[in-house]
Structures are given as C-alpha cells and as structure tokens.
Amino acid sequence: MPREIKDIKDFLIKARRKDAKSVKIKKNPENVKFKVRCSRFLYTLVITDKEKAEKLKQSLPPGLQVKEVK
C-alpha cells in the first residue's frame, strides 16, 4: 500500500525504522522521489529542490539498501 509523506523529518524517521528494507530514488527533470519500502507500506516523499534531495540522500541510514532509478 502506498503512502505519501510531505515532511522530510517524518520520512527520515520512517527510513530509520527496523522494518525499512530499501530506498529507491527516482530522478525526473522537475522533481526527485524517495520511496522507502517498509513491511506494510511504501512511503513516498517528493522533493522539487535538487540541493535538498542531495542532502537527504547523504543523511539516509548507512545500513539501508539504496537504489537509484532514472
């Protein structure tokens, strides 16, 4: 089941949960989508600022599998 998250801090909390398996990063010309797969939901965060997206990518937990999709 998909869920959309509007807040970056809320997304980071979801990404640090122990049931979070992986993060997919989808880059489009106008935005960047971060999708974290947890046991029940797929949480999506849409960011239009490229600099914020790079900072968020750096602050993801190190044990999480990160996959970039174009």
UniProtKB/Swiss-Prot annotation:
Gene Ontology CC entries for this record: cytosolic large ribosomal subunit
InterPro entries: Ribosomal_eL38 (IPR002675), Ribosomal_eL38_sf (IPR038464)
Keywords: Ribonucleoprotein, Ribosomal protein
GO molecular function: structural constituent of ribosome
Pfam families: Ribosomal_L38e
Protein name per the record: Large ribosomal subunit protein eL38
Biological process terms in GO annotation: protein-RNA complex assembly; translation
